[in-house]
Amino acid sequence: MFIKCVIGGILLFIGFVGHTNQLYVAVASNFYSTLQQISSEFTASTGLKVVITTPSTGTLYAQILHGAPYDIFLAADQKRPDELVKKGIGESKFTYALGRIALGSIESFPEPTTEDSLKKSFRYLAIPNPELAPYGHAARQVLTTLNLWQPLQKKIVMGENVGHTFSLLATGNVDLGFISLAQALSRTNRTNTWFWKVPLALHDPIRQDAVILNKGNMEDAKRFAAFLKSPVVRSKIRQFGYDLPELPR
């Protein structure tokens, strides 16, 4: 499946060759809905259409290594952007958001979702694949910190990324799932009792870095990077459930 995602992402671009006025953005699945909202404003002000691709951070990283011609990569970690800079594939790296995770429950879950929900009776718990998705890595850290990683092994269902995990939860295929706080807040038809905002003390910080890719449309990618750093856009990113890093002076 992973190899198919890598090849599929590269083939996706065959039909794009020669197109102008488009910016190709590879974005981690947790930030997809947020990017959809803010990219429309970028298009309105610049005339550039933003074309978004959104598997897991690990899958996007592999696609870039295999030549997928994205212009800018918005990861859910620092590791992959760092590696791209070291390999001479990317530059101008910066942190655009600090991710937060939440534990969500299905509609019929009998009580408010809290840390204790993990210690009670349920069928399945979905988490993003820790090897591919930074939010999955954080979820594994949470369970390990709570001494639940081994006891819950038979109940854990792995999603490819946090978007897949959210789908498993939304369709009722699992009772509980670790998702991004942004996804939790997006479900406006639910009360806040359906998710638990995981304390930062239970996992390492999720620093989400962006990197401009050297083989892409660097001029417009830099315009988009400046757009992400603007006060108005940073305020909107916070509204979607992210913390914000301090910008370098």
Question: What does each of the following model-derived ranges do?
Answer:
Residues 1-7:
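Bacterial N-terminal signal peptides that target proteins for export
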Residues 11-19:
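Hydrophobic h-region of N-terminal signal peptides that target proteins for export
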Residues 20-45, 51-54, 58, 62-68, ...:
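Exported/periplasmic ABC-transporter solute-binding proteins
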